[in-house]
């Protein structure tokens, strides 16, 4: 990010000690710096830039962000964007109560959309948004 004046942010990944694991995950892991830079440009500088950001691979599904380190079941583009988005909305800015958790999740989901819009295409972002809308609207009696 421009505000770093040529400095960098440490991105640290903990994966299984298996050469096949690295070969399988490397392309996805390598997208992380681009996402950090994008969100730093769109929001504010990565809030924990003086420390680091990273991932810890686990056999559990999905992901869970923790300040500066996300536990990940994989490195899918949407998942990485979502958990990274929580660094700004969830870890840097937190909710007053658990009933406000939708704010954190909403911004993290919006981060997925922004990542697609800027790093893939507007068409991909629109497709994601349509898919989410169709899913929500298909749930009888579900919350919106």
For the regions a protein language model found, what residue spans apply to each?
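Hydrophobic alpha-helical and helix-loop surface patches within well-folded domains
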Residues: 7, 13-144
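Structured beta-strand-rich cores of soluble
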Residues: 1-6
